[in-house]
Amino acid sequence: MGLSTYVGIFLLCILTLSRCKSGKEEYGTVIGIDLGTTYSCVGVFKNGRVEIIANDQGNRITPSYVAFSGDGERLIGDAAKNQLTSNPKNTLFDAKRLIGRDYHDKDVQGDIKRYPFKVINKNNKPYMKVQVGSEEKGFAPEEVSAMVLSKMKEIAEAYLGTEVTHAVVTVPAYFNDAQRQATKDAGAIAGLTVLRIINEPTAAAIAYGLEKKDTEKNILVFDLGGGTFDVSLLTIDNGVFEVVATSGDTHLGGEDFDQRLIDYFVKLYKKKEGKDITKDDRAVQKLRREVEKAKRTLSTEHSTMIEIDNLFEGKDFSEPLTRARFEELNNDLFRSTLKPVMKVMEDSGLKKEDIDDIVLVGGSTRIPKIQQLVKEFFNGKEPIRGINPDEAVAYGAAVQAGVISGVEDTGDIVLLDVCPLTMGIETVGGVMTKLIPRNTVIPTKKSQIFSTAADNQPTVTIQVFEGERPMTKDNHFLGKFDLTGIPPAPRGLPQIEVTFEIDVNGILRVSAEDKGTGKKSNIVINKETNRITPEEIERMIQDAEKFSDQDKQVKERVEVRNDLESLAYSIKNQVKDKEKMGGKLSDDEIKTIEDAADEAIKWMENNPQAETSDYKKQKANLESVVQPIVSKLYEGAAPPPPTESTPKEEL
């Protein structure tokens, strides 16, 4: 690697940094989060090994779904996904497919057509619009991702019994700068300091390679999830994980395979019944739920039935689906996964026989046809089977989190990642002048001297792009800034040094200096149209805290209501029991208690949206009637037990 190509490459020897006890910042327990398109997963390095943490439903993966019920209650994870078919317009998902993108991006526009919720344009960003209680509210994808991250944080805290404030979060290797920045912003909104953003295939390689650090191997990681696809080629040598090449598609995954099935059955229904079910969001979401189940079934079976009660206008739906039909409908998408594989092989300069192991990651790699295509491409080589495709990324993130926080027993791990796209600036004629080629190891720094294009030019505009095309118009614009106050001089004479610096998270800082005057200007690329402002982040943090408070209030209201309901029915049942309390009270006393209990029950039926304080007041009223009567039974005996939220049988 010549000095002219890469200047100042700093290898990320995180082990050395983390083991340096003097001056090491204390982060507490650092968690690793795989923030997925369809499912997310959280892990922690503890007691010498990784623990993948189950949620409150006992599931080790949590749906990346957020929903708002009719009374404004917020649901996240399993609870949100479970009510998708009954509340489609207020159930948000796929934030990862929208995060860091322009509203007018063709992929975004394609997705909007199939979402049951509204997506609106706000400052050229896609905002997800739902009904929250009595008002409509738009959420940035960062906010929705933050809600999912806050759920993962909550899951970890419940398991660890302590507050968690720092995390390592994974992103697709092919995420661009704006998408990485937006993911960090989501962490901040969720109350997490994201210490490191690492690429998903790299995390998976750590999970795979943790036990195989003594041998040098070339590993190809094929990561096909719910919404994104990455291929990375790494070398592992004595605990050093070096990414050699990476490629992929940030808009390809299991959801696209589901959509092909939905389109197929929609056409089939229209042909048989003459009706278009796409006009009914609930029908489409019912179909989506069932085709996703069928897709999973077809990974182990050759055929299945799609059966839906009351799909559309009261009619049931029942159709067979074979694995062969599923493969035929998705044949082009399945085959398109091999293009990035070819790309990384070409970029790395390795032959197929040089690959020691193929690691399949992501739920979509369970599809037999995908496994077959990968195996055939590598001349019959079997992929590694001993790794859980759903948990591998979170596992690797947890190991990296352990390394950063200085946990013992993580071993001598060094992670050398790469930037996925070429970075450069626009020069005269719209030419893309490359400063940092793709697949350069990060962190890295590169400088180059430029000059003015006209005599006495007082200002130069530095326009920053990422991409592989020779002209900037075909690449992805990141941002621009001006260097002003250049003294009058003939064109070509001033020396303007432009420096690109990429940090360990793959985030770019560009600076320019007039070598004659020492005047400087710089930009941390945040693509104003694609990234939320610090003020917006602060507002979203406050909103997140407000929602957290609201969640607590809703939970308290439900608990107090349940207490009142339980008390009322329990008292009614006890006074009816002649063998127990009912046999010790007079008819008038029984009637007084029953009337009070009935009044409380009727009040609850008439006031379903009552506040917590109202329920407490009603409970106090009921207790004030019951307690004096019941107390008489205990005169001269031990005092009665207090009336609890769940009344004992002998009041």
From Swiss-Prot:
Coiled coil: none annotated. Its EC number is 3.6.4.10. Pfam families: HSP70. Residues 125-279 are annotated as: Nucleotide-binding (NBD). ATP binds at residues 36-39, 96, 226-228, 292-299, 363-366. A motif (Prevents secretion from ER) lies at residues 648-651. Its main location: endoplasmic reticulum. Residues 1-20 form the signal peptide. Residues 399-499 are annotated as: Substrate-binding (SBD). Keywords: ATP-binding, Chaperone, Endoplasmic reticulum, Hydrolase, Nucleotide-binding, Signal. The keyword GTP-binding does not apply. The keyword Nucleotide-binding applies. GO terms for cellular component: endoplasmic reticulum lumen. It catalyses: ATP + H2O = ADP + phosphate + H(+). The chaperone activity is regulated by ATP-induced allosteric coupling of the nucleotide-binding (NBD) and substrate-binding (SBD) domains. In the ADP-bound and nucleotide-free (apo) states, the two domains have little interaction. In contrast, in the ATP-bound state the two domains are tightly coupled, which results in drastically accelerated kinetics in both binding and release of polypeptide substrates. J domain-containing co-chaperones stimulate the ATPase activity and are required for efficient substrate recognition. It is found in: Endoplasmic reticulum lumen. GO terms for molecular function: ATP binding; ATP hydrolysis activity; ATP-dependent protein folding chaperone. It is an enzyme of class 3 (hydrolase). NCBIfam families: PRK00290.1. Belongs to the heat shock protein 70 family. Endoplasmic reticulum chaperone that plays a key role in protein folding and quality control in the endoplasmic reticulum lumen. Involved in the correct folding of proteins and degradation of misfolded proteins. Acts as a key repressor of the unfolded protein response (UPR). This is Endoplasmic reticulum chaperone BiP. The lineage of its organism: Eukaryota, Metazoa, Spiralia, Lophotrochozoa, Platyhelminthes. The gene is GRP78.
